[in-house]
Amino acid sequence: MSVASQSLNSSSAGSALVELVDVVKVYATAAGEFTALKGINMQVGRGEFVGVIGKSGAGKSTLLNMITGVDHLTSGEVVVNSNGSPVSIHKMSEDQIALWRGHNLGVVYQSFQLLPMLTLVENITLPMDLCGRFNPKQSRERALELLRLVEIEDQADKLPAHISGGQQQRVAIARALANDPPILVADEPTGSLDSVTSEHIFEVFEHLVSELGKTIIMVTHDQSLAPRFTRALRIADGELVHSEQSEEGMR
């Protein structure tokens, strides 16, 4: 059995929340075509904390971009079954993808990407207001609840510049949860943080999976995190080369 088939079968087909089928991504460069993803097949089940581990340039971020729909795939398919109705992401228009993503997917970046002119609580209410899921009073109450979840509620009315990098990442996680999406994707969320802060952030993700039932797909270059995920996938040169189940991450 190939590595791609192993990773595809490691979650049962009936419970797959996210499925990638023969996903290929080719970029046109001055030096010619560059294939960033080479026929990726994988499934992610509900409630999994999946780590995609690889070196810089291995294709980790490109893989996340295919799942979130922020970039076009060259061939293949990405299917997400978040509410009982499977959606083929790349068959939707960009406007449809943006609306779908707002309700179904939370994204956490390494660089936080908080809006500097808005307070922390306003950064979290903004995606709620854009999706129209809550009225203004409900939005603020929910934002404060999410800040409480990531243990930074007392900083709610500060601007991002007035808190630390680790605190900003906590706010970014709260913002990703704003519309209560079933799926979070995280692109090197601890990459710019010190080891102690990184551990705190990772514990937040573990809590979201174990206590709130979220499904998380996280890419990282940090090999030492592999045992902490429920499943770790290794990516190199645009291909999945290894898949391993973790006893520690499953506890």
Task: Give the label of every model feature segment.
Residues 1-26, 242-251:
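ABC-family P-loop ATPase nucleotide-binding domain
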Residues 15-235:
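ABC family nucleotide-binding domain
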